[in-house]
């Protein structure tokens, strides 16, 4: 006889996309027929056969502290901003629940690739002394979930399914 899973609920959501910095603006832009696709002009994209992509603008990260911007990968930063939106939306339903009864489950394809790329360049161009000592904590796949749990004070665990 199968064990019945514990009930769970999604009570908030967030998004940071090329179309908008929150779910409402993203949905409105989508409904208005806007496209988040643009020309790629970054140095790293010059050798790519594809010259377009959907990029979240750097301005989307401005609300994060400079310290957090230096000590976390863009992947974790975007996850944190979206999680803050979801947390705000869910707050009326989660008030009074002990933090140890709330968990973060945040999936990622691979984690901090921009950190891996940047630090590889530091290593090859400047040697081992130029590599950021926070490289590993910044690039591991579970960094976004951990950052969200720390930021929101969630104590029930931080889990990262990785494809």
Model-identified regions with their sequence ranges:
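Conserved "HGTGT" condensation-loop signature of ketosynthase/thiolase-family condensing enzymes
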Residues: 1-157
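Short loop-beta-helix segment that forms the pyridoxal 5′-phosphate
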Residues: 157-163
């Amino acid at each position: 006889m199968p064990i019945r899973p514990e009930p769970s609920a999604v009570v908030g959501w967030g998004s940071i996309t090329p179309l908008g910095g929150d779910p409402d603006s993203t949905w409105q832009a989508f409904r208005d027929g806007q496209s988040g696709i643009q020309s790629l002009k970054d140095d790293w994209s010059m050798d790519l056969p594809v010259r377009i992509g959907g990029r979240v603008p750097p301005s989307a990260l401005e609300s994060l502290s400079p310290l957090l911007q230096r000590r976390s990968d863009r992947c974790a930063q975007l996850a944190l901003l979206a999680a803050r939106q979801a947390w705000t939306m869910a707050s009326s339903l989660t008030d009074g629940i002990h933090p140890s009864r709330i968990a973060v489950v945040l999936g990622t394809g691979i984690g901090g690739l921009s950190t891996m790329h940047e630090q590889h360049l530091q290593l090859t161009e400047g040697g081992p002394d130029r590599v950021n000592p926070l490289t590993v904590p910044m690039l591991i796949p579970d960094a976004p979930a951990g950052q969200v749990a720390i930021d929101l004070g969630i104590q029930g665990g931080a889990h990262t399914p990785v494809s």
